[in-house]
Amino acid sequence: DIKTCAKDTIRAAFDGVVRMAKPYYAYGNIVVIRHANGLETLYSHNFKNLVKSGDIVKAGQPIALTGRTGRATTEHVHFETRINGEHFNPNLIFNLKEGTLRRECIKCTRNGSKIVVKTHIPDNRIAQSPKEVKLPYPFLDLRYSRGDMPIILLNNREK
């Protein structure tokens, strides 16, 4: 959860397609954006959604206004990240305090029916460094220009 003022602008974290934009139970007004490689971001308790299902959005584009709809007692954004439906901590890729992107790529492995997200990628084939980076991202500001985040899905033999 990210504390906000009433009706602050929520922006898309990456390029993608809006999969859901509607009132949804305890989440209140919700926007779910599907990005490349199975990544989804979710933004809920919105006062007003500015996009609808099927809309194509760019990184940094306004998608909603913050609120406290659903099961919420104060204005905030409930922000989730998912890979193929599995939740993972957004702090693995975002530094919300500094407004930067922590990683340029992440590694996902399947453990039975669960997807495990890691940030250390020992594979020599990956040109991008998995070390922490300080790239601004558009959740708060439209300065992150890449618009997408590489996600490496490895099977058990490649671990």
Specify the residue positions occupied by each region the protein language model found.
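Short glycine/threonine/proline-enriched tight-turn/helix- or strand-capping micro-motif at secondary-structure
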Residues: 1-12
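Peptidoglycan cell-wall recognition and remodeling modules
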Residues: 41-47, 68, 72-75
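Acidic, glycine-rich catalytic/binding loops that coordinate metals and/or anionic ligands
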Residues: 52, 80-159
